[in-house]
């Protein structure tokens, strides 16, 4: 029986399914890491092995709590530290921590997760999404290095489905995972146009919604939940400070710095923005990702640095081609400080175009679209426009998508003709390795005619299938190095 650590899958749509499979002996959950807001739900209240990462933010461990890593293991995961560091930079609890202190924090979390894996003899870790944020980005390479199999569930691709893979490196290729289902032919039909209805850009997820009265009324529509959430945030904040004096001093300093950075960001945007662009010249359209986000911090690899991608793009283009860069509508000052704009201004023939300029007009007239892992490339190839990507993404093996490499020629990308039928066939093959169910509440909220019972049955069927597959096909290296 698989001895499993589950991270997430704690929402009401899926947690009862996971709990039931454990209780029936389908697999054994030794550790279940759940969100602090879910800890008192009935499915977790009486269950052993529940871990709340938020409770350990202050890192006040005792000597007997943590085991030391073997030397070979420390050496094996150390090359992954830049990715871990990039992900810790977005953790609010450790925000503005000096680099050297981040290294201490990472070492402590590494020992914590190593102890969980080794003492519980974990042989499988299940992640509900690509491992990101500081904590999961520590656990993932640690598990991989120890020969512990990882199963990653990724809500991506067509709405209402999720993909699965055994490693981040296989995401987009899906070469290592079995086919799960036979999609309906209608699922693989692609409208030959750019525009897509994206749930995360609609309703409560839209950029402007957070500042509206309606948004704030929704926030307090459940007073008990609202108060509990604010209380958790306040208590977590207090963990960061050793006394009231430190709390007041750092809060004042942080507030002042935030104000300055927001103001400076607006100044830089105003200074760089181009409101008039020529859609008839030769150019490549590069829509920026929202940052910080998993899609760049993890799936982007070294191209979490989006300016680096633009610099590489500039180097491969003919000198007279322009690059039109457009900011993400949800972007704030984070990862957009002064030197971001200084670097951008130093790249020849690059225009930072106004957010009001229509995305699809920019896409339609471009030679091709370039992005790290963005939906823009999927929109582009759907409408017949080729795309250049710099990271890993679910559609990366589809016709018309080019992964950046040093010898790639811009003219070859621009001249490639997408066969729409071949594109639909590629989507069909992708869908064979997806599940037509959901496990996230925010997706369910925007679904019409959602059937919770049917969804639960589909989830259970998939987990039974995948657990059986992993038991019948154990990792060759599982546990060997640990022994």
Q: Where do the language-model regions lie?
A:
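Conserved N-terminal ligand/cofactor-binding loop architecture of enzyme catalytic domains
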Residues: 19-113, 119, 158-262, 476-480
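Active-site donor-nucleotide binding/catalytic segment of nucleotide-sugar enzymes
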Residues: 278-306, 314, 327-330, 432-435, ...
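Short internal beta-strands
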Residues: 29-36, 153, 322-328, 332
């Amino acid at each position: 029986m698989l001895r499993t650590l589950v991270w997430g899958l704690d929402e009401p749509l899926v947690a009862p399914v996971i709990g039931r499979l454990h209780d029936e002996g389908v697999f054994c959950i030794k550790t279940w890491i759940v969100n602090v807001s879910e800890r008192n739900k009935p499915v977790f209240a009486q269950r052993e092995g529940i871990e709340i990462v938020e409770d350990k933010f202050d890192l006040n461990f005792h000597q007997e709590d943590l085991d030391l890593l073997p030397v070979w293991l420390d050496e094996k995961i150390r090359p992954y530290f830049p990715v871990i560091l990039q992900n810790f930079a977005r953790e609010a609890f450790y925000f503005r921590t000096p680099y050297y202190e981040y290294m201490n924090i990472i070492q402590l979390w590494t020992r914590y997760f190593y102890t969980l894996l080794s003492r519980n003899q974990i042989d499988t870790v299940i992640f509900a999404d690509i491992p990101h944020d500081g904590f999961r980005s520590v656990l993932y390479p640690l598990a991989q290095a120890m020969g512990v199999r990882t199963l990653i569930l990724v809500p991506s691709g067509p709405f209402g489905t999720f993909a699965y893979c055994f490693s981040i490196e296989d995401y987009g290729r899906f070469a290592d995972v079995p086919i799960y289902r036979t999609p309906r032919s209608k699922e693989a039909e692609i409208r030959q146009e750019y525009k897509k209805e994206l749930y995360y850009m609609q309703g409560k997820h839209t950029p402007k919604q957070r500042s509206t009265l309606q948004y704030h009324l929704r926030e307090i529509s459940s007073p008990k939940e609202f108060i509990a959430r604010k209380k958790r945030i306040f208590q977590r904040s207090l963990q960061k400070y050793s006394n009231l004096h430190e709390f007041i001093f750092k809060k004042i300093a942080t507030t002042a710095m935030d104000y300055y950075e927001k103001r400076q960001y607006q100044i830089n945007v105003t200074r760089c923005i181009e409101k008039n662009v020529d859609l008839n010249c030769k150019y490549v359209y590069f829509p920026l990702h929202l940052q910080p986000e998993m899609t760049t911090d993890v799936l982007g690899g070294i191209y979490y640095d989006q300016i680096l991608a633009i610099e590489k793009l500039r180097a491969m283009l003919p000198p007279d081609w322009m690059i039109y860069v457009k900011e993400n509508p949800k972007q704030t000052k984070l990862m957009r400080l002064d030197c971001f704009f200084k670097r951008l201004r130093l790249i020849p023939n690059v225009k930072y175009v106004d957010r009001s300029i229509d995305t699809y007009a920019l896409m339609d007239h471009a030679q091709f679209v370039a992005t790290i892992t963005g939906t823009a490339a999927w929109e582009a190839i759907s409408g017949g426009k080729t795309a250049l990507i710099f990271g890993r993404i679910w559609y990366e093996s589809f016709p018309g998508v080019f992964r950046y490499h040093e010898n790639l020629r811009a003219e070859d990308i621009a001249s490639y003709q997408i066969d729409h039928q071949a594109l639909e066939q590629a989507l069909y093959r992708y869908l064979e390795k997806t599940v037509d169910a959901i496990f996230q509440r925010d997706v369910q909220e925007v679904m019409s005619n959602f059937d919770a019972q049917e969804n639960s049955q589909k989830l259970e069927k998939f987990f039974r299938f995948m657990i059986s597959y992993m038991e019948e096909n154990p990792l060759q290296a599982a546990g060997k190095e640990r022994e």
